[in-house]
């Protein structure tokens, strides 16, 4: 059993991007669906879909990774911020833009999983899950 499924998801994405895979498969959960949805809305992946195999109890998410016209990575870095041993929460006023607006932080809020831009716009704070640039 893994202790941090979100870190596992981010590591799978990071590894797939490094070897330029067109997609990556990740075990599904509600938070991971939210993360994938934010990555799609913010333009870091093309799309995602959930698939379920009959012999497996848990479905999985297939993320279609995005690359530039010359094969350059859209996701340059992706890292976990709030960890199981050290949770990090931020108010909306404390959420500063990542790389001058070129990157995002993904926040888990009472309204679901959203980007830092949406959190600032809606004036909602929450747990800072990760940072993508």
UniProtKB/Swiss-Prot annotation:
GO terms for biological process: translation. SUPFAM superfamilies: Ribosomal protein S8. One of the primary rRNA binding proteins, it binds directly to 16S rRNA central domain where it helps coordinate assembly of the platform of the 30S subunit. InterPro entries: Ribosomal_uS8, Ribosomal_uS8_CS, Ribosomal_uS8_sf. Part of the 30S ribosomal subunit. Contacts proteins S5 and S12. One of its GO terms (molecular function) is rRNA binding. Belongs to the universal ribosomal protein uS8 family. The keyword Ribonucleoprotein applies. This is Small ribosomal subunit protein uS8. It comes from Rhodopirellula baltica (strain DSM 10527 / NCIMB 13988 / SH1). It holds the Pfam family Ribosomal_S8. PANTHER family: 40S RIBOSOMAL PROTEIN S15A (PTHR11758). Keywords: Ribonucleoprotein, Ribosomal protein, RNA-binding, rRNA-binding. One of its GO terms (cellular component) is cytosolic small ribosomal subunit.
């Amino acid at each position: 059993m893994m202790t941090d499924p979100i870190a596992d998801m981010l590591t799978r994405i990071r590894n797939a991007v490094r070897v330029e895979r067109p997609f990556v498969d990740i075990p599904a959960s509600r938070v991971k669906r939210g993360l994938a949805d934010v990555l799609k809305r913010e333009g870091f992946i093309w799309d995602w879909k959930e698939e379920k195999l009959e012999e497996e109890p848990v479905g999985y998410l297939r993320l279609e990774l995005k690359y530039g016209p010359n094969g350059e990575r859209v996701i340059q870095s992706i890292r976990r911020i709030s960890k199981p041993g050290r949770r990090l929460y931020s108010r909306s006023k404390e959420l500063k833009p990542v790389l001058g607006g070129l990157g995002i932080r993904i926040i888990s809020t009472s309204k679901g999983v959203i980007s830092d831009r949406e959190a600032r716009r809606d004036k909602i704070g929450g747990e800072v899950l990760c940072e993508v640039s």
